[in-house]
């Protein structure tokens, strides 16, 4: 019993450190403007017919708020309304189609009933940094019921999971060619409009934000990609957290 408890605590600590590791990586990209879409898929109820909700933002500007019930598009600056509306309109159909696909996918995914209660709750985060003329690459982070975590990188069409249990589900999703294609071409469909809006945002200063707490990072931060250009700041963060991982493993022995 005691050994099992120590092992569980050890795994929990390693998971948190891995999440911080990914934040150290992405923190090095803070100077780049990016598009972020947050998708939520859940089971509808008679009292709440909402089964999906999507929000897409460029930095702090909400450009699309979409659900199976209604749609709104907003811009924080009247001067950006036209461009924000164009991006939002372009993303509307891909977002709607993808959420429908994800709903079907998660409903057919077998999960440990001890970890989930009823219909699995899916959270997806897509991050697309300004491409600057390069091949557009996006990161897709998947969180099923705060228990299964994996990430897809369109840059090299690779997947990474947080643990073996997540890997089982991840491999099945990877075998779904239609899903993979939707993830791959989500950005290219609207790339020109998105890049133009990101370029416009680049000319304006960004507001700084504090580093998120460990609880905020749990369900939204990706694992670091297998290969990617990273700034010096990102490398320093990764190095420090890697040392922490070594200490964690040493204490667990």
From Swiss-Prot:
Its main location: membrane. Disulfide bonds join 37-56, 90-190. Residues 198-230 are annotated as: Disordered. Induction: By retinoic acid. The keyword Signal applies. Keywords: Cell membrane, Disulfide bond, Glycoprotein, GPI-anchor, Lipoprotein, Membrane, Signal. Expressed predominantly in embryonic brain. Pfam families: MHC_I_2 (PF14586). Residues 228-253 form a propeptide. It comes from the Eukaryota. Glycosylated. GO terms for cellular component: external side of plasma membrane; plasma membrane. Glycans are attached at residues 38, 70, 83, 143, 156. InterPro entries: MHC_class-I_related (IPR050208), MHC_I-like_Ag-recog_sf (IPR037055), MHC_I/II-like_Ag-recog (IPR011162), RAE-1 (IPR029287). It is found in: Cell membrane. Residues 1-28 form the signal peptide. It is a lipid-anchor; GPI-anchor. One of its GO terms (biological process) is defense response to bacterium. Acts as a ligand for KLRK1. This is Retinoic acid early-inducible protein 1-gamma. It comes from Mus musculus.
